[in-house]
Design a protein with these regions (language model features):
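Bacterial N-terminal signal peptides that target proteins for export
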Residues: 2-8
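Non-catalytic, solvent-exposed segments at the cell envelope interface
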Residues: 22-344
């Protein structure tokens, strides 16, 4: 009984004391204030250091770009650098209509030599319409451009490239178009003269020199020469005229051969002589090419004034190459003027 009374009393005490306890008053949940959205601000970049304001500059004047020029035109350019300036090709010399240009070449390719340099070069220009012939000698030491190679003496053109290179060299440097060529060496030259029974040469300038023996010639006289004598006469160099005197003598001998070949005896033997000469002379001129020129040859044989002879005396200047070679520089304009007369 007492135990029940104690429990009841405790329970009553708790109930009475609950209101007297200071528990916090329950508040309503707070109302959240609206969120304020701030406008975005630009993110500042790092400061840029100040720079100098450039001063105005002048606008450059445009330069003209030169149009590339083919220095060699239709000719082959040099195969290597040149120690000297290579001249431009000259204009082509326009000869008379139907004229025929033959380059006659004397080479020093004897058996004891290894070269085939041209010792003599004579251009024979035949004008059938006028019945005239011009002989033009080219000095072997002319310093010219060999198309496709370099600057060199003209006398090596045939040795390096045969007829084609020599013809191209004459066209490039002197404007001469070559139709045919005839090449003879020293031994064959003697045979040509001996086959004709020797030739009669009219000597313009007398001199004395030694070849296989001592020769003495007087001006204005005619001398009968066999092959060896004629060869020595052409090649002698010790007289006062120098190389240009050799050109004159070569022309004298060519005319003597021509006169003998075109004589009555020569004409009757023409087919025979042609067959013999093809064994001695290298040429691209056939018998059918020669026959149309026989009437002109007959006219010239009867009238020697129809033959004109030219050299380049006074139209060259001596010069020493960087390698020490002695050559002749051509006065191209003077030579062109001469050729325009000779080929017309």
């Amino acid at each position: 009984m007492n135990a029940v009374r104690k429990v009841s009393l405790v329970f009553v005490t708790i109930v009475i004391s609950i209101p007297a306890c200071s528990f916090p008053q329950m508040l309503p949940p707070p109302t959240l204030a609206p969120t304020v959205t701030l406008p975005p601000t630009n993110t500042p970049f790092p400061p840029v250091p100040p720079t100098d304001t450039p001063l105005p500059t002048d606008t450059p004047i445009p330069t003209l770009t030169p149009t590339p020029v083919d220095l060699w035109e239709n000719f082959p350019g040099p195969s290597q650098g040149s120690a000297t300036e290579i001249p431009r090709p000259v204009r082509t010399v326009i000869g008379s209509e139907d004229s025929v240009n033959i380059i006659v070449i004397g080479t020093d390719d004897a058996w004891w030599r290894s070269s085939m340099n041209s010792d003599l070069m004579v251009l024979v220009s035949i004008n059938p319409n006028e019945g005239t012939v011009s002989l033009v000698s080219f000095p072997r030491d002319l310093y010219v451009y060999l198309p496709g190679r370099n600057m060199a003496r003209i006398n090596i053109a045939y040795a390096y490239g045969g007829r084609d290179l020599l013809a191209l060299t004459l066209l490039y440097n002197f404007g001469v178009e070559v139709d045919y060529y005839a090449q003879v060496n020293f031994a064959s030259f003697e045979e040509v003269v001996d086959t004709l029974g020797g030739i009669d040469v009219e000597v313009e300038q007398g001199f004395t020199d030694v070849c296989n023996r001592t020769y003495s010639y007087q001006s204005g006289r005619t001398y009968h020469m066999d092959g060896l004598t004629a060869l020595c006469y052409v090649r002698m160099r010790r007289n006062s005229g120098g190389d240009f005197a050799r050109h004159v003598r070569a022309q004298e001998v060519l005319l003597a051969i021509f006169r003998k070949a075109i004589s009555l005896e020569g004409l009757t033997r023409l087919p025979e002589l042609y067959q013999q000469y093809t064994q001695m002379v290298e040429t691209d001129m056939g018998l059918s090419d020669m026959l149309p020129l026989v009437p002109v040859a007959a006219q010239v044989a009867q009238d020697p004034t129809r033959i004109e002879r030219y050299t380049f005396a006074g139209m060259t200047s001596p010069w020493t190459t960087p390698g020490g070679g002695s050559v002749l520089l051509p006065d191209r304009e003077a030579i062109l003027a001469l050729l325009e007369v000779a080929l017309n």
